[in-house]
From Swiss-Prot:
The keyword Cytoplasm does not apply. GO terms for molecular function: GTP binding; GTPase activity; translation elongation factor activity. SUPFAM superfamilies: EF-G C-terminal domain-like, P-loop containing nucleoside triphosphate hydrolases, Ribosomal protein S5 domain 2-like, Translation proteins. CDD domains: EF-G, EFG_III, EFG_mtEFG1_IV, EFG_mtEFG_C, EFG_mtEFG_II. The gene is fusA2. Pathway: Protein biosynthesis; polypeptide chain elongation. Transmembrane segments: none annotated. PANTHER family: RIBOSOME-RELEASING FACTOR 2, MITOCHONDRIAL, TRANSLATION ELONGATION FACTOR G-RELATED. This is Elongation factor G-2, chloroplastic. It comes from Glycine max (Soybean). Residues 1-79 form a transit peptide. GTP binds at residues 100-107, 164-168, 218-221. HAMAP family: EF_G_EF_2_B, EF_G_plantC.
Amino acid sequence: MAAESSLRVATPTICNLNGSQRRPTTLSPLRFMGFSPRPSHSLTSSSLSHFFGSTRINSNSSSISRQHAPRRNFSVFAMSGDDAKRSVPLKDYRNIGIMAHIDAGKTTTTERILYYTGRNYKIGEVHEGTATMDWMEQEQERGITITSAATTTFWNKHRINIIDTPGHVDFTLEVERALRVLDGAICLFDSVAGVEPQSETVWRQADKYGVPRICFVNKMDRLGANFYRTRDMIVTNLGAKPLVIQLPIGSEDNFKGVIDLVRNKAIVWSGEELGAKFDIVDVPEDLQEQAQEYRAQMIETIVEFDDQAMENYLEGIEPDEETIKKLIRKGTISASFVPVMCGSAFKNKGVQPLLDAVVDYLPSPLDLPAMKGSDPENPEETIERVASDDEPFAGLAFKIMSDPFVGSLTFVRVYAGKLSAGSYVLNANKGKKERIGRLLEMHANSREDVKVALAGDIIALAGLKDTITGETLCDPDNPIVLERMDFPDPVIKVAIEPKTKADVDKMATGLIKLAQEDPSFHFSRDEEINQTVIEGMGELHLEIIVDRLKREFKVEANVGAPQVNYRESISKTAEVKYVHKKQSGGQGQFADITVRFEPMDPGSGYEFKSEIKGGAVPKEYIPGVMKGLEECMSNGVLAGFPVVDVRAVLTDGSYHDVDSSVLAFQLAARGAFREGIRKAGPRMLEPIMKVEVVTPEEHLGDVIGDLNSRRGQINSFGDKPGGLKVVDALVPLAEMFQYVSTLRGMTKGRASYTMQLAMFDVVPQHIQNQLATKEQEVAA
């Protein structure tokens, strides 16, 4: 808590780095003057046509800034001479993200954090379109977060780097790349809805990267709020072990504050000064028994992490407050449990204790294992980088953002070492050196120049030309390649064309920049039918892309009907012998190969394996076989969709001393693919979505009937407060286009739904035949 000795606590001050408190001061307009915009580099017409004619462009990150006034009131580094002097010890760094289902209150919570820490001078509201972190026009209009936004603030002498992430499933990539570079996370839950589908998705993403987290049950002021039901859902839906460290005092309109079980005190907000003041009082009498019960459960759980504390507890001696915090921190960082807190960000209650928990329980970079990578020259060799300024520099580029005044900005998490403006770094993935133009600390879409970045920092770099999302930047003399991120494949596509021929080049420029920012967005150009196709994670994702083309690149476009990204696979093993022979005077072409095609588990992708023995196919020709097969995997034999979950095994072959070549074996592999896949029982796969519909009970029958008509499979039913029913179903994506309009119509606008990709499954034969026929007609 910010001031433990005082019963009356005021918090709209920020901690200065020397330990004193200061009030925020209003910035003078003169502070914003003298900013000289730098022109961003544009692509030439020739380079545009080169890119536009390529089969696919896909790279990395976020959005284009509009506000350009740099914030000067937060200096990140104190400079001494020509070197950086760390003003905040690394142990006091917290790199955190805020993640949750859509509308759980992520951005609202972040806005309160920025206000109470003194970073902002007023509270921005999502519903008013004034939230600092939702700076894009589309975000302000729709009231949702589309791109992750980064900022830095301070609390109790700790530096907190925050990334606010989207909750909509279409923008799950933003959550993925944020969690990849964060040390801890706050997972928000709506106290009425509990654990929702996208909450489960982001929880699994955090599990994947081993991110310690704390839970905040938000919206305790809402009708139907139930802290204890949400706590139970954390167990049943997420398989996690919640450690309750706060209890609510009241709920709905009577929600007044929380019981802090660590200190065994109640924290009550009066509603004055936007929640900046609160009282620390004794636990109310009617809640003392319940508080003692949950406090005992908390202590019994945490003393398992310390033998002395356990021994004392068995002898009737409770650990003191400092020991309790230390043990909660230990269990949180080891992911043995997740602390659970509660509050109402919108009503300004519970946010300051949440900030205390970030400082007390979430890890600093020093609390986590050393970052592991590989040697670029020898990928089998593991290299470690410890979080220290004295280590060689190593950082991961996790986001690209276009800025109209600075150009392309590359967001980097610095894991080790120092980075200064004007220095050179090595892109270890590409083996290219890059020069750092400027180092910028970001606050949403405003920026401030800094001279040096140190271990633990999240910084934006200007001037990089060849680095994309997921690539490693490092000291040229000490190269290391860090683990890359996984990017989801698009599941939906639409055809798009500019309304006027004059906009062709402008649209190409826009698509290239948007694809560089967002690795989950792809586009391709089919010159034969003169059509451009854009691909993304859902209808909303592509709708935002088209809207950004219009607003940011001034391109009006005609958009076709959505189409599904199907896949092709095989159902059985087949072996084929293929001989490629061509003789037309001079040196001919000869390659003889035998390839076995085997089905693999769903989600396995493609795998090549060589079982050649005795030099039947020389080693120098095997790469030709690999390349030929890989080229074919993007164009299946049924309807031209990508082929997945197939293992190709080169088992035998022969060659000619004169006529054989890498090209000959590459062409032979193509022929073997066409024949072999047809023999292996080819089949088409379609994306199946997990759909959750929340509807009033009187419309339940209509909803179920409609889902059944869409080839849906009903999995389960559930209840929600207010007489609402929950339908959980699996439905093919092809049947879900424009579903929102249908659902609103049959329920008079009272139902809602969410959906996310669950799996790929076999397409029914009659639909497969229709798709194959359609592809043949297009080809003809």
